[in-house]
UniProtKB/Swiss-Prot annotation:
Name of the encoding gene: lspA
HAMAP family assigned to the protein according to its UniProt record, in alphabetical order: LspA
Lineage: Bacteria, Pseudomonadati, Planctomycetota, Planctomycetia, Pirellulales
Molecular function, one GO term: endopeptidase activity
This protein's UniProt keywords: Aspartyl protease, Cell inner membrane, Cell membrane, Hydrolase, Membrane, Protease, Transmembrane, Transmembrane helix
Protein name as catalogued: Lipoprotein signal peptidase
Membrane topology qualifier: Multi-pass membrane protein
Length: 223
């Protein structure tokens, strides 16, 4: 039987909060985050293995154009960070990736940031990208006979260019997940205010009023 708090003013009693209302965040946030992270990382690793098996190592075949002159498939090994930045620091970026993944999990589930569905989705994408690239940075794909500098390099295969003079560095699905998550975080910071403490936002739009919340100027029903 549900208990209710008696309002001294004589207005309708306020129902006691249920267990789900008192929870820090919905339990399905675990499934959302870890599902995205694992699926994203697995898709990235599968795609890299399949493309490199099909197209070979960098420099062995010409570009396979999907949209001639603009978008295609070309294998490459990136020994830097995202889009080739920081070349030669693969192990440093691997250490940063491990720290970032641990910090994300702590932020979501220990500091309760998982109250936000949007934020959970964004960080799930980022973690999936971290997993995909971390596997390569730790050298799990590398085999004896390959160049030593590739041992902490990341396999890339997506080619996009606006023209022959303007070519974007090759990237992969993990990079795409990282960028998608980063864009979502920017959108979150500009358009989605954080939910009140202890309240999960679910799929609520910013500023949306809860169904039982009285509007300004209305009075509660008398008992």
């Amino acid at each position: 039987m549900n208990s209710a708090k008696v309002n001294p003013s004589g207005h309708a009693p306020t129902p006691a909060p249920t267990a789900s209302q008192g929870a820090a965040f919905p339990a399905n946030r675990y499934a959302l985050f870890f599902g995205l992270a694992i699926a994203g990382g697995a898709l990235d690793l599968w795609s890299k293995e399949a493309i490199f098996r099909w197209r070979g190592l960098p420099g062995t075949q010409d570009v396979y154009w999907i949209i001639e002159g603009y978008f295609g498939i070309e294998t490459a090994v990136n020994i830097g960070a995202v889009f080739g930045l920081g070349a030669g620091q693969g192990l440093v970026f691997a250490a940063i990736s491990v720290f970032a993944a641990a910090a994300i999990i702590a932020w979501l589930f220990f500091f309760k940031a998982a109250r936000s569905c949007w934020l959970t989705f964004a960080l799930g994408c980022i973690t999936g990208g971290i997993i995909g690239n971390l596997y390569d940075r730790l050298g799990f794909w590398w085999k004896p006979g390959l160049p030593d500098q590739w041992q902490s390099g990341v396999r890339d295969w997506i080619l996009w260019q606006a023209s022959d003079q303007w070519k974007w560095p090759n990237f992969n699905i993990a990079d795409s997940l990282l960028v998608t998550g980063a864009i979502m975080l920017l959108v979150q910071s500009f358009f989605f205010p954080p939910p009140p403490h202890g309240e999960a936002d679910g799929n609520e739009l910013p500023g949306r009023r809860a169904p039982d919340e009285p509007t300004e100027g209305t009075k509660p029903a008398a008992s």
